[in-house]
Amino acid sequence: MPPAPAIVRTLPSLRRALERLRARRGTIALVPTMGALHEGHLALVRQAKRRASRVIVSIFVNPTQFAPHEDFGSYPRTWKADLAKLAEAKTDLIWRPDVSTMYPRDFATRISTEGPAIARLEDHFRPHFFGGVTTVVGKLFIQCRPDVALFGQKDYQQLKVVTRMVADLDLGVKIVGVPIVREPDGLAMSSRNVYLSNEQRARAPTLYRTLKDAAGRLRNGDHLEAVMADGARTIEDTGFSLDYFEARHAETLSPVGSLKDGPVRLLVAAKIGDTRLIDNLGV
């Protein structure tokens, strides 16, 4: 059995651990997570090990990115399983702060963004979300001082928001987006997939199949508006409550009218039962 990674839970212990890592020279990669790790997270860790000498994984279920009606209290917390997976992946350091460390009682500063953060996608349906994400990610970057940080492309708008924040604030962290890891039937891996009933799980791959079908039709020259309308209808007919099914510019997330408007990304968010799923695909 591989040795367990070093685990730190306070800022002073994190600083001491970072001094030891920096003393060995080389570069540091950070993989921010909320735990409940799956193969998608481990793909980030493997990519991090290829890009840096040392890898830090943070595990923190961030309360500020959840609205009161969302699933902060029930979000999966699987610490023992997470630790075993990170040991197997040969992670160097786990940063596992508690809420009072990240947000002391007198905490009063937030990072807010515009640009990709106001694209009327996740920001429209979860207006609290990106303020929480940018603040916690900014703090993690300041605390861990990584050279590179890795994020999954499943949360595509989040990836673009973090990339914009780093550029705007001169944080000096290279942001790497890692392709979505999927189940054999195409469902994007997500910690929230455990919420799905057997029946819902059987329907869930509809999102990816619809993305693939739409991308193929667009590449074949079909009219974008008709393709997107057909896709939205397919998703709703499968029993989903659709938040959005959108074609956007892959970099700016601005709306597009056709493939001629630049690299295009298709993005979808929908609920089946009480579980909200997101996915995306480049055209």
Curated annotation (Swiss-Prot):
Q: Which domain of life is it from?
A: Bacteria
Q: Which organism is it from?
A: Nitrobacter winogradskyi (strain ATCC 25391 / DSM 10237 / CIP 104748 / NCIMB 11846 / Nb-255)
From its record, what is one biological process in GO terms? pantothenate biosynthetic process
Record gene name? panC
- Per UniProt, beta-alanine binds at 65
Signal recorded as keyword: no
- Record keywords: ATP-binding, Cytoplasm, Ligase, Nucleotide-binding, Pantothenate biosynthesis
Taxonomic path? Bacteria, Pseudomonadati, Pseudomonadota, Alphaproteobacteria, Hyphomicrobiales
What InterPro entries is this protein classified in?
Cyt_trans-like (IPR004821), Pantoate_ligase (IPR003721), Pantoate_ligase_C (IPR042176), Rossmann-like_a/b/a_fold (IPR014729)
Its Gene Ontology cellular component terms are:
cytosol
The UniProt function text for this chain reads:
Catalyzes the condensation of pantoate with beta-alanine in an ATP-dependent reaction via a pantoyl-adenylate intermediate.
Query: What name does UniProt use for this protein?
Result: Pantothenate synthetase
Reactions this protein catalyses: (R)-pantoate + beta-alanine + ATP = (R)-pantothenate + AMP + diphosphate + H(+)
